Amino acid sequence: MTITVLKSAPGLPPAPQGDAADVVQVMLARLRAEGEAAARDYAARLDGWSGEIVVSPDQVARASEQVPEDLKTQIRYAHDNIRRFAEAQRASALDFQTELRPGLIAGQKQIPLAAAGAYVPGGRYAHIASALMSIATARAAGVGQITAVSPPQVGRGVHPAILYAMSLAGADRILALGGVQGVAALAFGLFGAPPADILVGPGNQFVAEAKRQLFGPVGIDMFAGPTDSLVIADSTADPLTVAWDLVGQAEHGYNSPVWLVTDSAALAEAVLAHIPGCIADLPEPNRSSAQAAWDALGEVILCTDREEMAATADRYAPEHLHVQAADLDWWRGRLSAYGSLFLGELTTVAFGDKASGPNHVLPTSGAARYTGGLSVHKFLKTVTWQQVAPQALPDLARATATISRAEGMEGHARTADIRLEKLRPTLRQVGTG
């Protein structure tokens, strides 16, 4: 593979190891022992919130009145797309049964989880879309009870637009809690919520670490890191559009990588020339975030042809993969490692982040090599069942007993033998023994 790196990523300075893990471990131990009292104390000390933790329907209604009507309209538009896509996913998850041999019947069944916990970030940015992505998807899957948490703002509580989105998407219970205490409330079933079977939704390093430490007794959507995006662009792409797509994703934060992969040196140089102006056009703190991410983690890679571009993209396995190149059908068929694929100049990643329909909770840090993003399937248990009739028993019992004894598992073999012996008289009568 012959590639040229036109802009390299020097990377971030080493982060202190163990700090977040140690802090989270101590917090979870206290929350597990002291429950709601500890959660209230952390909310007061860390978020400056001493108000009600459980958000009542009346509070949601009053908060919704503060949301501008145009914003409500656009939230409903996004919710409708997300819900429709999730419902289509649910329809694709089918129960079935099949007769493998005469009398040997097996099947598959989809069972929704009893309870889900959705974490909705609310720090520097009000992540309205995250509420829709997590809650609407769980609702489409048929989850029994959905509890949502989001960090309260000092003197105000949960952001009104987030509350509106949570309610619209179908949350059964909303808690004004953020950080580790919010995740713990979902996992442990605090404030009247049932303990969650799965924890979903993005968050900062402490939220991600809390989910990691809780995983096992409770499921999680994924181990998520900073968001990342890769743009594939050929000579047909518009350099200014590509530059804005890179900068628009870099504004997520100083630790959000963005990569451009192209086979056009002219396009690469033009994009590099546009980047500073695009960053300068952003307001603060977005400008500083985008600049830091671009300086430390932005890369521009020049390849010889589209096959090399595709191979490079697959090696990076980005969370978001945006193709602005000719022959989109070829790219859709060739690319194989990404969280979500955005095809064509019109299909900016921001559409997927906010409103187009497919879920924006996606694998990061190269995890797209082996897994996909949040979907209704995360809220479903795909279980199997089997049933044996007399005519299937002789062959099945012999195979089981023989394999079991070859493995040294005599007890397993006896469970097959005893059934064959009990049915042998009947099997002789029907001529199958």
Curated annotation (Swiss-Prot):
Source species of the chain: Ruegeria pomeroyi (strain ATCC 700808 / DSM 15171 / DSS-3) (Silicibacter pomeroyi)
Name the coenzymes or cofactors required. Zn(2+)
The family this protein is said to belong to: Belongs to the histidinol dehydrogenase family.
Name under which the protein is recorded: Histidinol dehydrogenase homolog
User: Which positions are catalytic residues?
Assistant: 319 (proton acceptor), 320 (proton acceptor)
Query: Where, in this chain's numbering, is Zn(2+) bound?
Result: 249, 252, 353, 412
Q: Which InterPro entries does UniProt cross-reference here?
A: Ald_DH/histidinol_DH, Histidinol_DH_CS, Histidinol_DH_monofunct, Hstdl_DH
One biological process term from GO is:
L-histidine biosynthetic process
Query: Is Oxidoreductase set as a keyword in this record?
Result: yes
Q: Which PROSITE patterns match?
A: HISOL_DEHYDROGENASE
Which cellular component, as a GO term, is one annotated location?
cytosol
